[in-house]
Every structure is written in C-alpha cells, then in structure tokens.
C-alpha cells in the first residue's frame, strides 16, 4: 500500500480515539519525505483535533500527541516552534501563548522572512509588546534550522546586544521540553 493511501485510510478512522489519531500522525511522519507539504498541512489537523479532544476527554494521550505534533512542525513553522519551546514552562512565565493573538501576525511575517518570501521586514510596535523576546525566539529558531550559518545582529547598544546573545544561549541550552 502506498503511503498516501495509508494516510487517507488513517484519517478515515474515528479520530476521537487517541490510538487512531496517533496512527494518523505516524502516517504523516512516513509521508513527510515523499510529500512534505501535505504531511505538514495534515499535521495541523492532527494538532487541532488533539487539542480539542485533550480538553474534551481530559486525555493525557491527546495532550502528548499535541506536543508531538508541534515538535513535528517546529523546525519549519515559527509559530509551532514558539508554542513548543514553552511547553514545559510554568504558565505564569510563558511569553508567546498568552500574547499569541497579538503577536501571531508578526510571527507569520518572520516566517515569510525566513522562507525568503520577503527580502526585508521592518517591525514597528510600541514598547513592551514583545518585539525583543519574539526576536530572541526567532534567532534561536533560525540557529536550530541552520546551525552551520552565522547570524549577524546589530544594535545601537553593545550592552543590549550582549544581553540578546546571552539570552539566545540561555534559550538554546535550557529550553528542552
């Protein structure tokens, strides 16, 4: 049986069953080398359903599947990365998820920049919105995506750049869900 047929059959099952949704997710992991775009598009459905059923059913298995679904997309999807890296953070210390509604447009613009759909991105927002922290998340995401490539940063303040550098190192070393 071809992988695409396997995926189709997996998604025809009762996906409110944790085992069935897990099988559907596993089929997407098999599909990824053959059809990357379809695998990651369908994974958004797995993530939506696993979040819904985790809440409705109070299911730990669905909750964990939601985490695995985020991890599957995190190297390629900045929004998924931002949610995944804070998975184990104490809710009161989370940055992205509580502000996601406001920062999602900026995260999508940063995604477009990383995907070479934009040559330049200028972000102008009021102080305290979260530009710097989101930029730190972006730098760590880029560093993880392309560890062999350098990242150049500039600022009016050497102390600010030193702080950004140290925070990036902290994020890279201590963010392991």
Where does each model-flagged region fall?
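N-terminal accessory segments
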Residues: 1-118
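Conserved small/polar residues in nucleotide/adenosyl-binding loops
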Residues: 174-177
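Walker A/P-loop
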Residues: 118-135
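A structural signal for short coil/turn segments at secondary-structure junctions
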Residues: 117, 146-147
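Walker A/P-loop NTP-binding motif
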Residues: 136-145
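A structural signal for short, well-ordered beta-strand segments and their strand-loop junctions
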Residues: 122-124, 152-155
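Conserved Walker A/P-loop ATP-binding site and its immediately adjacent core
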Residues: 153-166
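Alpha-helical scaffold elements adjacent to nucleotide-binding pockets in ATP/GTP-utilizing enzyme cores
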Residues: 138, 163-171
């Amino acid at each position: 049986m071809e992988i695409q047929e396997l995926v189709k059959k997996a998604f025809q099952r009762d996906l409110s069953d944790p085992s069935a949704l897990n099988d559907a997710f596993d089929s997407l992991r098999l599909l990824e080398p053959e059809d990357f775009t379809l695998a990651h598009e369908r994974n958004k459905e797995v993530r939506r359903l696993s979040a819904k059923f985790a809440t409705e059913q109070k299911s730990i298995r669905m909750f964990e599947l939601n985490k695995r679904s985020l991890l599957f997309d995190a190297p390629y999807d900045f929004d998924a990365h931002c949610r995944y890296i804070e998975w184990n953070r104490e809710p009161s210390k989370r940055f992205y998820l509580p502000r996601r509604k406001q920062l999602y447009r900026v995260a999508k613009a940063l995604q477009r920049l990383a995907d070479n759909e934009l040559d330049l991105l200028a972000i102008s927002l009021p102080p305290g919105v979260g530009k710097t922290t989101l930029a730190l998340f972006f730098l760590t995401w880029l560093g993880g995506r392309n560890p062999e490539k350098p990242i150049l940063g500039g600022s009016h303040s050497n102390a600010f750049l030193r702080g950004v550098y140290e925070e990036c190192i902290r994020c890279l070393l201590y963010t392991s869900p």
